[in-house]
From Swiss-Prot:
The keyword ATP-binding does not apply. GO terms for cellular component: cytosol. The active site is at C2, K602. The gene is glmS. The lineage of its organism: Bacteria, Pseudomonadati, Pseudomonadota, Alphaproteobacteria, Hyphomicrobiales. Catalyzes the first step in hexosamine metabolism, converting fructose-6P into glucosamine-6P using glutamine as a nitrogen source. Homodimer. One of its GO terms (biological process) is fructose 6-phosphate metabolic process. It comes from Brucella melitensis biotype 1 (strain ATCC 23456 / CCUG 17765 / NCTC 10094 / 16M). It catalyses: D-fructose 6-phosphate + L-glutamine = D-glucosamine 6-phosphate + L-glutamate. One of its GO terms (molecular function) is glutamine-fructose-6-phosphate transaminase (isomerizing) activity. Residues 283-422, 455-597 form the SIS domain. Its EC number is 2.6.1.16. This is Glutamine--fructose-6-phosphate aminotransferase [isomerizing]. Its main location: cytoplasm.
Length: 607
């Protein structure tokens, strides 16, 4: 969601702040701004819309100074317009904020009663006035921030810059991530290591309740009880590889085409293709002692979790609940301490997923996580971490992170099956071999891009689309619908094909495309029956199947996308590609912002 950067250094800071903000664009935003100090005086520039608008503003109205803070805003309180953009300033300070101040209305009412005037609709401005009030009592900036933090309720990451003090930045974290970066004679604050990559690869992550005082020469970190603490210093990895789209039009397209390579890396981390066995040293969980698995996630990660539910139940004979994190955390479900709680997140900072993890941890469950960012909060609070190794994913609509999540959990399902005695060594080798073939099949599917792009000419002209699938193709149908509405803004729904007669069939007419995901597996004939029901009502079918399925369908389709014939186990990995390409090329034809679709954020760090 919102992105934060702070720099205290020796070089002109404005271009460095903008460079860092560009690296935070992937998080999603609707406005941006920076503030600097020059000769002790605060000044700022803000702009609605993309960073290019801020750059134009700065070209005409430069901001000098070697210390500053910057922000990309994803609106929560107040419209996405310039006067609500960060940084927010008073006569004494500038502040940027990621998160939600839940008691801002109460704080605002108190401050307005004291005669303080608010200029924006945001919750952040209440923080600015609250700290300013303490400064006006004669407190130092450190004392003022320290004394205000206990009065803030909600989730927040904050960075402060103070009028008249070019030697000080203060940051605070309660929920959304905030990292401290270490340089030579300069220091940094950032929402993640990606933002700090141009300047340093040496970072510490603040923990919940921490606040940090930065000078050019170092940092002092305090916990929620105001006691000095040290946080581990670590080297960040692979944060510079995101800056180029290469020969691709969008990051999303680039990331789709990276999938054969990154999936190979993921699988090789968990599987030994020479012996055909799971790498036991990579697992870190004794599945023989697990009697139930709960997998919790949000968005695309939830659909990956739902695919994995089928795998764990069918292959490992392990009962599984897959839950949406924002619902799970409030269900107050009974949990057995012999259960394993697994959490899936690209960023490792998803607010609802993290809250669900903490709920399970409080119940005494062992915690596992499947993550792309291994230095994240969820990783640090897990007993076992299973990295997806997808590399930075910049497009808001997930592609390679999704298939790498599937790859990791498919490997874990084999490990669980072997540990529980549900499969023998021969079957383990068969399944490992099938997964080893997935990158080759995915490469073949990528060669169908031009054919799929042609299908999208008709798809881009409709207002509603229905996706259908059975078995593991059902969560793929939901993921396909999510992809299409995320980036093309076409309304789409994903349903289990067997549910067609229980409501969705009422929507079918000659204007309604129905995308059917149907490999020629044991469920294919049932899905054909559903396609016949659609065809009988004039619905236009886009069938995604293999050669055998295409030849036996005997139904007129709007288009048929023929994929390689693959084993049922790996079909979700292979069939994920065409639904990504359908969404991508439809969005391109419609002229939307594919990498940064409206109203969406890459990392959802507030509830």
């Amino acid at each position: 969601m919102c992105g934060i950067i702070g720099i205290i250094g020796n070089d002109e800071v404005a271009p460095r702040l903008v460079d860092a903000l560009k690296r935070l664009e992937y998080r999603g935003y609707d406005s941006a701004g920076i503030a600097t100090l020059q000769n002790g005086r605060l000044d700022r520039r803000r702009a609605e819309g993309k960073l290019v608008n801020l750059e134009k503003r700065l070209a005409g109205e430069p901001l000098p100074g070697v210390i500053g803070i910057g922000h990309t805003r994803w609106a929560t309180h107040g419209r996405p317009v310039e006067h609500n953009a960060h940084p927010h300033i008073t006569t004494r300070l500038a502040v940027v904020h990621n998160g939600i101040i839940e008691n801002f209305a109460e704080l605002r009412a108190m401050l307005e009663a004291e005669g303080r005037k608010f200029e924006t609709e945001t919750d952040t401005e209440a923080v600015a006035h609250l700290v300013t009030r303490e400064l006006e009592k004669g407190k130092s900036p450190v004392e003022a921030v320290r004394d205000c933090l206990p009065h803030l309720k909600g989730a927040f990451a904050l960075a402060f810059l103070f009028e008249g003090d070019e030697e000080l930045l203060i940051g605070a974290r309660q929920g959304p991530p905030l990292a401290v970066g270490y340089g030579e004679g300069e220091m940094f604050l950032g929402s993640d290591a990606i933002a700090l990559a141009p300047f340093t690869d040496t970072i510490s992550y603040l923990e919940d309740g921490d606040w940090a005082v930065l000078t050019r020469n170092g940092v002092s970190i305090y916990d929620e009880n105001n006691k000095p603490v040290e946080r581990p210093v670590q080297k960040s990895q692979n944060t510079n590889m995101l800056v180029s789209k290469g020969n691709h039009r969008h990051f999303m397209q680039k990331e789709m085409f990276e999938q054969p390579e990154v999936i190979s890396h993921t699988l090789a981390n968990y599987l030994d293709f020479t012996t055909g066995k799971v790498r036991k040293e990579a697992i870190g969980i004794d599945f023989s002692k697990v009697d139930r698995l709960t997998i919790t996630a949000c968005g695309t990660a939830y659909y990956a979790a739902t695919v994995a539910k089928y795998w764990f139940e069918q292959i490992a004979r392990l009962p599984v609940d897959s839950d949406i994190a924002s619902e799970f955390r409030y269900r107050e479900m009974p949990l057995s301490k012999d259960s394993l709680a697994m959490f899936v997140s690209q960023s490792g900072e998803t607010a609802d997923t993290l809250a669900s993890l903490r709920y399970c941890k409080a119940q005494g469950l062992k915690i596992a996580s499947v993550l792309n960012v291994t230095g994240s909060t969820i990783a640090r609070e897990s007993d076992a971490v299973f990295p997806t190794l997808a590399g930075p994913e910049i497009g808001v609509a997930s592609t390679k992170a999704f298939t790498c999540q599937l790859s990791a959990m498919a490997s874990l399902a084999i490990a669980a099956a072997r540990a529980r005695g549900a499969i023998d060594e021969v079957r383990e080798q068969e399944l490992v071999h099938q997964l080893s073939e997935a990158p080759r099949f995915i490469n073949q599917v990528l060669k169908l891009e031009d054919q799929i792009a042609v299908v999208c000419h008709d798809l881009s002209k409709v207002n509603h689309v229905l996706y259908l699938g059975r078995g593991t193709s059902f969560p793929l149908a939901m993921e396909g619908a999510l992809k299409l509405k995320e980036i093309s803004y076409i309304h789409a729904e994903g349903y289990a094909a067997g549910e067609l007669k229980h409501g969705p069939i009422a929507l079918i007419d000659e204007t309604m495309p129905v995308i059917v995901i149907a490999p020629s597996d044991r469920l294919y004939e049932k899905t054909v029956s559903n396609m016949q029901e659609v065809a009988a009502r004039g619905g236009r079918i886009i069938l995604i199947t293999d050669k055998k399925g295409a030849e036996s369908a005997s139904i007129d389709t709007m288009a048929t996308i023929v994929l390689p014939e693959v084993p049922e186990f790996i079909s979700p990995l292979v069939y994920a590609l065409p639904i990504q390409m359908l969404a991508y090329h439809t969005a391109v034809l419609m002229g939307t912002d594919v990498d940064q679709p409206r109203n969406l954020a890459k990392s959802v760090t507030v509830e």
